[in-house]
Amino acid sequence: MPKITNVVFDVGKVLFEWDLRHLFAKLITDKGELEYFVTHVVTPEWHFQHDAGRALDEMVAERVAEFPKYAAWIAAYASRFNETIPGPITGSLEIVQDLAERDVPLYAITNFGAEFWDDFRPTQPIFDRFQDIIVSGVEKLVKPEPAIYALALQRFGLEPGTAIFIDDNHDNVISARENGFAAHHFKDADSLRRELIALDLLH
């Protein structure tokens, strides 16, 4: 069995908090309307289309046509997306720093829209610690599709079984295990740190 010497992270809900409500709770004071908006108008499922590579302006225009009374809030999704990401997950960025200080090669595979990534990436110097990051919206491949893991192995130059992939989504974890990676289903930074210590990647 190969030794695990590389670590591959997901970004949202592993390194950074993410929820559409973080933005829209600032704009929509009525809780019932807020829940309607994030379950029927700007929803995680609709947002996922941008993760998969669909153009943001096309998505927004289509949604505004369908829900014209919400045009301003739909526009805010496009212009204020970084506010859906309030900050890092407790303890996760410290793990990245500790791995980097031990010269463990670091990578990421993230379901993230290309245009939103261009806005978010420069705000977070932690990503300078990573050798490469695969962004779904750029590649037009998304987790848990096997093709995105195949691309990662090829582009990162990794042999199957030599990297552990960390994701909060169970389906993504299962697919990673079926496509060349060891995998950790992320719940919190403490349990992740324990696993990385067990793998001798951290002390």
Predicted regions span which residues?
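N-terminal helical cap/lid subdomain that shapes the substrate entry/recognition surface
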Residues: 2-94, 101-102, 113-116
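Residue-level marker of regulatory loop/turn positions in helix-turn-helix DNA-binding domains and
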Residues: 88, 109, 141
